[in-house]
UniProtKB/Swiss-Prot annotation:
This is CRISPR-associated endonuclease/helicase Cas3. It comes from Thermus thermophilus (strain ATCC 27634 / DSM 579 / HB8). Changing residue 70 to A: Loss of endonuclease activity. Residues 14-207 form the HD Cas3-type domain. NCBIfam families: cas3_core (TIGR01587), cas3_HD (TIGR01596). The lineage of its organism: Bacteria, Thermotogati, Deinococcota, Deinococci, Thermales. Keywords: Antiviral defense, ATP-binding, Endonuclease, Helicase, Hydrolase, Metal-binding, Nuclease, Nucleotide-binding, Plasmid. It is an enzyme of class 3 (hydrolase). The gene is cas3.
Length: 920
């Protein structure tokens, strides 16, 4: 038989009917072409620029490469995997010799394309990089051992197999009409060009491999096969909700933010700085809370999208709670921007499905009944809601971690980067990250610029060295010596650097009172003595928050229903609406306690099960936020969850000593809004807890949360002060503490300790910075450099939701291992979600979607040693492993004891306190 007949006999998908290999290759190429034709002109221009070809030629070239992703299936190893298909291939004249051990087809794809692309005329380096990229379409490039095993097979292979593969490659190029790109200078393909093909191959394959979208059995010999495949591809993208790009018309600020009567100085500076921008830019906004940074960033996105043709927006925040809080605001903005058109918007973090606003968008995107029109406005299509695909949606709100996974070699990291390509990426609260995460952030900024994206970086506070590192990561050169003006400021880095200083929205003088007695009992008395009013206490650890809540006194558990009754009903803003919606089903849940004098006391931290934490967060925002009824006597005890992005407003605030930037963040929760206040709280006052002996270790454990030196330096800078100007004093204090690190300036009794703690801090910073450089794609040319230290992650073959303790540290945050658990109560012989034994936990058999969601809503992440280490050794129930929602969770029986040496603790779940560790 002929080479053509042999090649056409090869199969890609088994079954009756089967799907020929050439057919699947053309299907995948068609999806790639259809995707690119729906993308903005600027995305297509990037592909053309990558390869030095006219636009149509560049798209055909990229699509042809994508089609070749499965060329490795044209191998005896793969074709022997289905007996019926193997017999057909043998009848077509392709012999099977001795088959050695199994090798994944992606490994063969790389080896085959290295040779064939060079034969085609591509320079060796470009051919090798593209071959490795296309071979990685299932998540990872091949490692040396895999390639060695594959080469052993090739040494005994019949030459007809090579001819069949060469015919397939030429046929794909012929059908697509794909030209060869002109030789690129040094013979290399730029890393961003390789990534654009690499990612497109992966997700085009996901679509083309769905038999409900691309039925098997279609004959690729037909002359109109590619035309039909393009029709199916377009229909598939329409069904999945892939949006066609619509050019944005420039709108005025007031049209998009009608609730703001007049833009402030920050918001007015954005269009002025962006005027004339013709290339992607970095916009750095340094300003305190309350200056409208979010609206400024969203308006910057609109102007950049209208001016440069960016494909969409991703807003990255430090926590799930902050992402949840911003999601409805971004949705409202996009719907005003879209004026009724359909917009694909995803909420991207691990517990997004618990968010009622996001659940509503998933419902809106569900297929309509016959005769029903599709709804306009924001929707969340199910296809994009899958973890690996969410970043492909043009609009998203989520955690920074979801973006940072793009610069770590987790499975399909390159798909995330493609999703961020030619987009406006807003990075909020960048002051909240450690040195390691900041190193990953710098790598992300380098990639965003290379991929044609713009970035808006927002921060309340930033030490000069951190600011410089971020600006230089984008600019690719030193920006030392640039006069950026005083704080608050906006800095634009484009073809040059421009900066504009702003008048603060308000200058608040906060009275500062230091409490040297930090034990919870006297602190509780001090807080109660400050009533009436809305009093807040932000402490540094969950254990301390629980202890302070207890010390405030015995009380009656406060249910949601009782809270509504005491307030005379539920009305007000968004947070109150969430509380109102929860009332019918969750009215009996405990959200706090009532003291004998009528004081309402609330507790908020991260050790509540997810649904309880979310409900408590809504209650806290409703009671201590901007609108709605405000109880006359209320105390909130919280951890750091209250210092980031939550619009809280206290009459009086206590805080444990923390780094100076975080103290300013916390002080921003004082007198945030104009409202009547008790006379004794007419002026904002901050109570600062500093232990008399300056011992931040056991039993406070503040040194486990913050660096000893930074706490000492913050205290040294604040001692003797009785007031703070917010934000007026911020920049000078930041410079003194973070840039003027000089232990010799400390009092004699602290000097040696300061020297030791500064040395430890500098060593940790160096370690974290080096770790970030090693493990991330810190430079673009490390995309396929799997021989270097960054290959550690690839060698682990990490999923991006990996739960193994030994590999967690390689992800986006350094720190102690943790595990997400579902607390279960033993009642009789069974395990239940509730202590009364009404909701049995599904541990065997199949788990329905409703059961999985119920378990997921009860999850809580724990890190107390040795709990994660022990639980991560245990296999989750088999049914949980099959569920995308549950596979990272472990069941934890309440009351279980964990031991480490002579220490032991028992895990309990208290309805008021959350997860508690009791010594035994």
């Amino acid at each position: 038989m002929s080479v053509e007949e042999a090649a056409l006999a090869l199969w890609a998908k088994s079954g009756n009917p089967f799907h020929p290999l050439l057919a699947h290759m053309l299907d995948t190429a068609a999806v790639a072409l259809a995707v690119l034709r729906m993308e903005p002109p600027r995305t297509r221009a990037l592909y053309a620029e990558d390869w030095g070809l006219p636009e149509e030629g560049a798209l055909a070239w990229a699509a042809a490469l994508v089609g070749l992703h499965d060329l490795g299936k044209a191998s005896p190893v793969f074709q022997a995997g289905w007996e019926e298909g193997k017999e057909r291939v043998q009848r077509a004249g392709l012999p099977f010799g001795e088959l050695l051990d199994w090798v994944a087809h992606g490994v063969f794809t790389e080896l085959f394309l290295r040779r064939l692309l060079k034969e085609k005329g591509l320079p060796e380096r470009a051919a090798n990089d593209l071959a490795a990229a296309l071979g990685a379409h299932h998540g990872f490039p091949a490692n040396a051992e895999e390639k060695s095993r594959a080469r052993r097979h090739l040494r005994t292979e019949d030459p007809l197999w090579k001819e069949a593969r060469r015919w397939l490659l030429e046929e794909v190029f012929r059908r697509l009409g794909a030209p060869l790109p002109p030789s690129q200078g040094n013979g290399e393909a730029r890393p961003e060009a390789v990534l654009r093909v690499m990612a497109l191959a992966s997700f085009a394959d996901w679509v083309a491999s769905d038999p409900s979208l691309f039925p098997y059995g279609r004959d690729p010999r037909r002359g109109d096969y590619l035309k039909e495949a393009l029709r199916l591809a377009q229909e598939a993208l329409n069904r999945l909700g892939w949006p066609a790009f619509a050019k944005a018309q420039r709108r005025e600020f007031g049209e998009l933010f009608p609730y703001i009567p007049k833009p402030n100085a920050l918001q007015e500076s954005v269009p002025a700085l962006l005027e004339g921008a013709c290339t992607p830019v970095l916009l750095l906004v340094e300003a305190p809370m309350g200056m409208g940074k979010t609206e400024a960033a969203l308006y910057a996105h609109h102007l950049l999208q209208a001016g440069l043709g960016h494909r969409g927006l991703y807003v990255a925040l430090p926590t799930q709670a902050t992402a949840n809080g911003l999601f409805p605001r971004v949705r409202g903005f996009l719907e005003r921007l879209g004026e009724g058109s359909r917009l694909e918007l995803q909420l991207q973090h691990g517990t997004a499905l618990l968010n009622p606003h996001y659940a509503g968008l998933l419902e809106r995107a569900a297929p309509r009944q016959v005769g029903e029109e599709e709804e306009g406005g924001a929707v969340a299509s199910a296809w994009f809601s899958a973890r690996k695909r969410a970043m492909l949606a043009p609009y998203g709100v989520g955690t920074l971690d979801q973006a940072l996974l793009g610069v770590l070699r987790v499975k399909h990291h390159f798909v995330r980067l493609w999703g961020l390509m030619n987009r406006v990426v807003v990075l909020d609260e960048v002051h909240a990250y450690d040195v390691y995460t900041s190193g990953l952030l710098q790598a992300l900024l380098r990639w965003l610029r290379a991929l044609g994206s713009s970035a808006v970086v927002m921060t309340a506070t930033l030490p000069p060295s951190r600011r410089r590192a971020l600006l230089e990561a984008w600019a690719g050169e030193e920006v030392e010596g640039q006069d950026l003006g005083p704080y608050p400021r906006v800095v634009l880095v484009g073809e040059g650097v421009k900066a504009r200083s702003l008048p603060p929205a308000r200058e608040v003088e906060v009275a500062l009172e230091v409490l040297r007695e930090v034990d919870v009992e006297p602190l509780a008395q001090r807080l109660k003595g400050a009533l009436p009013g809305a009093v807040g206490a932000i402490v540094n650890t969950v254990d301390r928050a629980q202890d302070l809540y207890r010390a405030l006194g015995e009380g009656t558990p406060l249910t949601l229903e009782e809270l509504a009754r005491r307030l005379g009903g539920i009305s007000g803003g968004q947070a109150w609406e969430e509380v109102r919606q929860a009332l019918p089903e969750r009215g009996g849940e405990v959200v706090g306690k009532v003291l004998t004098d009528g004081t309402l006391v609330f507790l908020l931290h991260a050790r509540f099960p997810a649904e309880e934490r979310a409900l408590r967060g809504s209650v806290v925002l409703a009671l201590f936020g901007k609108g709605g009824p405000r109880p006359p006597r209320a105390i909130l005890v919280a951890t750091q969850v209250a210092e980031q992005s939550l619009d809280l407003d206290f009459d009086l605030l206590y805080t444990d000593l923390a780094p100076i930037d975080l103290l300013f963040q916390r002080s921003g929760r004082l007198h945030r809004h104009e409202r009547p206040r008790p006379e004794e709280h007419a002026r904002p006052r901050l109570l600062l807890g500093v232990p008399e002996d300056l011992d931040f270790g056991k039993p406070l454990y503040w040194d486990k949360v913050y660096e000893d030196y930074v706490l000492l330096a913050t205290w040294r800078a604040l001692s003797g002060r009785d007031r703070l100007r917010v934000p007026g004093d911020l920049e000078a204090l930041l410079e003194e503490i973070y840039e003027g690190e000089n232990p010799e300036s400390f009092p004699e009794g602290l000097r040696e300790r300061a020297k030791k703690s500064l040395k430890a801090l500098q060593e940790r910073r160096d370690r974290e910075a080096n770790t970030a450089r090693r493990l991330s794609l810190s430079e673009l040319d490390r995309l396929l450099a799997y021989w270097d230290e960054g290959a550690l992650v690839a060698q682990e073959r990490l999923e991006d939701d990996e739960e193994k303790a030994e590999t967690q540290r390689l992800l986006t945050r350094l720190g102690d291992p943790s595990v997400a658990v579902v607390p279960l109560f033993r009642v009789g012989e069974g395990l239940f979600l509730d202590r009364e034994g009404r909701r049995r936990a599904p541990l065997k058999g199949e788990v329905s979607r409703e059961e999985a969601e119920a378990l997921f809503r009860r999850a809580v992440r724990l890190s107390r040693f040795p709990l994660p280490q022990e639980l991560l050794k245990e296999e989750p129930p088999p049914a949980w492993r099959k569920s995308g929602l549950l596979r990272g969770l472990r069941p934890l029986e309440v009351g279980r004891v964990f031991r480490s040496g002579e220490r032991a603790f028992q895990v309990e779940l208290d309805p008021e306190l959350g997860v508690v560790y009791l010594p035994v």
